[in-house]
Amino acid sequence: MSAVPLRNNKAIAADVRSITVLGATGSIGDSTMDLLRGAPERYRVEALTGNSNIEGLAKLAREFNSRFVAVADPARLGELREALAGTGIACGAGESAIIEAAARPADWVMAAVSGAAGLKPALAAVDRGATVALANKECLVCAGDFFMQRAAQAGACILPADSEHNALFQALSSGNREELVRVIITASGGPFRTWAPQDIEQATLEQALKHPNWSMGQKITIDSASMMNKGLEVIEASYLFALSPDEIDVLVHPQSIVHGMVEFSDRSVVAQLGAPDMRIPIAHCLGWPERIKGPSARLDLAKIGTLTFEAPDFERFPGLRLAYDSLRAGRGATTVFNAANEVAVAAFIGGHIRFGAIARLVEATLNDWTRSGNQAPLSSADDAIAIDHDARKRAAGLLPQIAAKAS
């Protein structure tokens, strides 16, 4: 039994739903809080967590009268308590407090803690059978089989919160699994879609951060420029919907209006369209199994005029090929792919490698890990985190060599 409900067969949501937002001060959290702000009569906030933005977290806690608030940095607990003095809001700090927030009795949990740190809190929500809007890539990229099996066993409901997987989630409800031929994830192509490979190699940080359509954080914007993000989304789709790599295609769509498509056996293709606004997929998750009124602009196709599509260029964007390779390799390779990419992006931001070296470092790390013979099935969150740590060490060790070759 899948933890992703591909048919609308769940009871209508309660009049007032209790909500926990893990990662409330990040970009996904900000969009979520904006939606909650628009319907105070419908939602009650149970818990909020943040990384280190005490001022922003405390402001949200006061505004929404949250019952519990946690900050990831244990050293900031005193500041958080001071910021919430006199409110009666319970406070916590550190990993255990973030997990406690996730385990509290909320009907709906937004899992938007970034990085591997988001895995254990998401599992805490899953283990109590919550409805979890999943915006953390690592839960699937690093521990996909294990995470989805655990969700199914606990009776949890996993709702994809990012735009592409939410689009597939909506389109998949038009048919049955045995009728599916393939899913198609769209990609804008990023700022380097038409650049020559040799020019992409030399791209600057400023150029990589100029995404043509989406407003996102620094790391994911760079991932979009390299199309590593699309590779990660291919991996996520495989685990979310139990798809083989051959059942997942990527199509470059510069306008970012069509977010995902599903082809069925009768050759019908069902697509989900919407403006490039993260509040749209989050609103779908927040209202599911109903639909709520969202604040986003309505889609005006006449104004847009033209929608174009093209095949991805694997020479221009080798990261996409590496994602498929790691997915086919299995047994922890996707965890290595993700960890090595994070090390590579940080090195690029820090000025230690060229943009073109990001994919080379990821490939070198995957090859080094494969030669080590450490491949083993994942059976726990600790297994996934151990592989993640090992891959980061390998990538860091290979970094000087990759940087020297590019200089």
From Swiss-Prot:
Superkingdom per UniProt: Bacteria
Amino-acid positions noted as binding Mn(2+) in the UniProt annotation, renumbered to this chain: 162, 164, 233
SUPFAM superfamilies: 1-deoxy-D-xylulose-5-phosphate reductoisomerase, C-terminal domain, Glyceraldehyde-3-phosphate dehydrogenase-like, C-terminal domain, NAD(P)-binding Rossmann-fold domains
Names of required cofactors: Mg(2+); Mn(2+)
Pathway assignment: Isoprenoid biosynthesis; isopentenyl diphosphate biosynthesis via DXP pathway; isopentenyl diphosphate from 1-deoxy-D-xylulose 5-phosphate: step 1/6
Annotated binding of NADPH, by residue: 25-28, 53, 136, 138, 217
The protein's Enzyme Commission number: 1.1.1.267
Keyword line: Isoprene biosynthesis, Manganese, Metal-binding, NADP, Oxidoreductase
Biological process (GO), any one: isopentenyl diphosphate biosynthetic process, methylerythritol 4-phosphate pathway involved in terpenoid biosynthetic process
InterPro entries found in the cross-reference section: DXP_reductoisomerase, DXP_reductoisomerase_C, DXP_reductoisomerase_N, DXPR_C, DXPR_C_sf, NAD(P)-bd_dom_sf
Any one GO MF annotation of this record: 1-deoxy-D-xylulose-5-phosphate reductoisomerase activity
Amino-acid positions noted as binding 1-deoxy-D-xylulose 5-phosphate in the UniProt annotation, renumbered to this chain: 137, 163-164, 188, 211, 224, 229-230, 233
First-tier enzyme category under EC: oxidoreductase
One Pfam family of this chain: DXPR_C
Reaction(s) catalysed by this chain's protein: 2-C-methyl-D-erythritol 4-phosphate + NADP(+) = 1-deoxy-D-xylulose 5-phosphate + NADPH + H(+)
The family this protein is said to belong to: Belongs to the DXR family.
Known role: Catalyzes the NADPH-dependent rearrangement and reduction of 1-deoxy-D-xylulose-5-phosphate (DXP) to 2-C-methyl-D-erythritol 4-phosphate (MEP).
Matching HAMAP family: DXP_reductoisom (MF_00183)
UniProt-recorded name of the protein: 1-deoxy-D-xylulose 5-phosphate reductoisomerase
Species for this entry: Bradyrhizobium sp. (strain ORS 278)
Lineage of origin: Bacteria, Pseudomonadati, Pseudomonadota, Alphaproteobacteria, Hyphomicrobiales
Chain's gene name: dxr
